[in-house]
Amino acid sequence: MGKYAKNARNPAKSCRARGSNLRVHFKNTRETAKTIKRMPLRRAIQFLKNVQDKQECVPFRRFNGGVGRCAQAKQWGTTQGRWPIKSAQFLLELLRNAESNAEFKGLDSDRLFIEHIQVNRAPCLRRRTYRAHGRINPYMSSPCHIEVILTEKQKYVGKVSHDDSQKKKVSKKKLARQKEKMMRE
């Protein structure tokens, strides 16, 4: 079992999954993972399916050189976006793996959200392409490592409001004026 970059806040209420040396572009996968971070699990799965169907785009913020503009990126507050289908497929498989790990632990999959997702570069794989005049150029691939931690949302209990405990705050000036008014009467 590999080491994770981050530990879960509550290990009893969280599950994790990881993939190493995945043959999928690092830059596209990083942008896709950044988009689904902090999303509820159901929404993230639906988003990745929509990306595969080109119904929603992945906004490109860091690795956006030469990325075209699309209207679907407006909902993310940017103009550049793409539909990295292979990255979405790999992330979808990883989320399904993490979800099955959560079910094995007895967690409620409807209350899970993506607490941590990280994409790291893996060692490049080298191939060659043949060019004119007998030259050879490198034909590199940029694989990546992905890790994800899902955590169950906690139920927050709101404070009970008491009418007698919530008194209207009055400034010193206003108190002095009220006392002065009472003295006159």
From Swiss-Prot:
Region (Disordered): 160-185
Keywords, ordered alphabetically: Ribonucleoprotein, Ribosomal protein
GO MF annotations, alphabetized: structural constituent of ribosome
CDD domains the UniProt entry points to: Ribosomal_L22 (cd00336)
Pfam families: Ribosomal_L22
GO biological process, one term: cytoplasmic translation
GO cellular component: cytosolic large ribosomal subunit
Disulfide cysteine pairs (residue numbers): none
Domain of life (superkingdom): Eukaryota
Name of the protein: Large ribosomal subunit protein uL22
Organism: Maconellicoccus hirsutus
Lineage: Eukaryota, Metazoa, Ecdysozoa, Arthropoda, Hexapoda
